[in-house]
Regions:
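Short linear sequence signals and composition-biased patches located at protein termini or domain-edge surfaces
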Residues: 2-36, 120-259
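Autoprocessing Asn-cyclization modules and mimics
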Residues: 12-129
Length: 259
């Protein structure tokens, strides 16, 4: 059978996505490390590469796709070696055509050919999978409709208390690459979400569970708590503060209010 797609998370975890569809926003309530008895949250965000200006990968249809979907040949009108940010091993490529879309993990790049080898670190390259695989967007005879490719990024945020327990930090992880520190001395990360379903429009929920879905998320409510680097000489304790904010999200689904 098909392997579950691995979900990037904190070091030492082996999370998987709940379905073959990776949403634009993937809540991860209580999947982060525990701090002072409080489980923290993680989040995975999927978005298209919008920073490639000279030769966007989706400017022209692909020149060819291997019959089993294991590789693609990019049009010479999109020279890979002249991209602002060249395609590399570990990138994620979305293939789209009239049959649907699928996400693949780059295992090799040679000339204009991008390869999606088996047994990739995220289990994305499974041409034999019954759903969500590259063969599902083919014609069934080894050929494919006109197909475009686009690089996408899967960004994961979580807290890390292991690298230096004295300096807990916020980590940003791109695809399956190692995480990088983006902020220091943060002790708590909590997320909730406002949904638009056209019926009850739930607010401040920790996850979008059935009958709702992550595609209905319209707003993320974020709480970050941090402390000072040194203890206060008077109180002998750290100074702690919390920041709350909201981030509005667009274009995750469409509801016709005039129907």
């Amino acid at each position: 059978g098909a392997k579950e797609v691995l979900r990037p998370g904190p070091p030492g975890t082996s999370y998987t996505f709940d379905s073959e569809t990776i949403a634009a926003v993937n809540p991860g309530p209580m999947l982060g490390p525990v701090w002072n008895g409080q489980p923290t949250d993680i989040i995975n965000i999927l978005y298209a590469d919008n920073a490639e200006f000279s030769h966007p990968l989706n400017d022209h249809p692909l020149a060819a796709i291997a019959a089993n979907g294991s590789s693609i040949t990019v049009s010479n009108l999109t020279p890979l070696n002249r991209m602002d940010n060249p395609i590399r091993v570990g990138d994620l490529i979305a293939l789209s055509n009239a049959k649907g879309s699928t996400l693949q993990y780059v295992t090799d790049v040679s000339g204009q050919t991008i390869t999606f080898g088996a047994n990739d670190p995220m289990n994305l390259n499974q041409p034999g999978a019954p759903a969500g695989s590259v063969t599902q967007i083919g014609n069934g005879d080894g050929t494919f409709p006109t197909t475009t490719a686009m690089r996408v990024y899967l960004i994961t945020y979580y807290l890390d208390f292991n690298e230096d327990p004295e300096t807990p930090r916020l980590i940003r992880r791109i695809n399956n690459d190692p995480g990088r520190t983006v902020a220091l001395i943060l002790e708590n990360l909590q997320l909730s979400y406002d949904l638009v379903d056209g019926v009850t429009n739930p607010t401040a929920v920790k996850n979008a569970v059935s009958p709702n879905s992550p595609s209905q998320i319209r707003k993320a409510n974020i709480l970050l708590s941090g402390r000072s680097a040194a203890k206060n000489r008077t109180t002998g304790d750290f100074l702690r503060r919390s920041l709350t904010t909201q981030v509005s999200l667009r274009s995750l689904s469409y509801i016709d209010r005039y129907e």
